[in-house]
Regions:
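Thiol/selenol-based redox catalytic cores and closely related redox-interacting motifs
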Residues: 36-116
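Local sequence-structure signature of Cys/Sec-based thiol-disulfide redox active-site neighborhoods
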Residues: 1-21, 25, 29-34
């Protein structure tokens, strides 16, 4: 059985809720704070591919950095969006949960149950 990995930010309430659900399940999992261990471009691209999502699908458009960089007005390629997300992790929706070949954006947190 594949182990579950949750990519999260400890101060995020949705991440904390998803982590609590994982703990309650009793299933083994690994929690990765992607601020301490940042995504590589290849890693994020692979996670998005497994999830069937594009970089824009996980973009946090209400973050100050989104506005500061003028991203709403930019027409970037997926590759350029990946570079932007890796450079500015605050722009990444969270948590991202991986189990083998399946990846989900666990919003709401209860959606993590799909992987249990």
């Amino acid at each position: 059985m594949a182990e579950i990995t949750i990519y999260q930010k400890p101060t995020c309430s949705t991440c904390r809720q998803a982590m609590q659900l994982l703990k309650e399940s009793g299933k083994p999992f690994t929690a990765i704070n992607y601020y301490e261990k940042p995504f590589t471009k290849a890693q994020l691209k692979n996670l998005l591919k497994k999830a069937g999502l594009s970089p824009k699908d996980i973009l946090r458009t209400k973050e100050d950095i989104y506005k500061d960089l003028g991203l709403a007005k930019k027409n970037l390629s997926d590759d350029e969006w990946l570079d932007t997300l890796v450079a500015h992790p605050d722009l990444i929706q969270r948590p991202i949960v991986e189990k083998g070949e399946k990846v989900i954006l666990a919003r709401p947190a209860e959606s993590v149950k799909e992987l249990l």
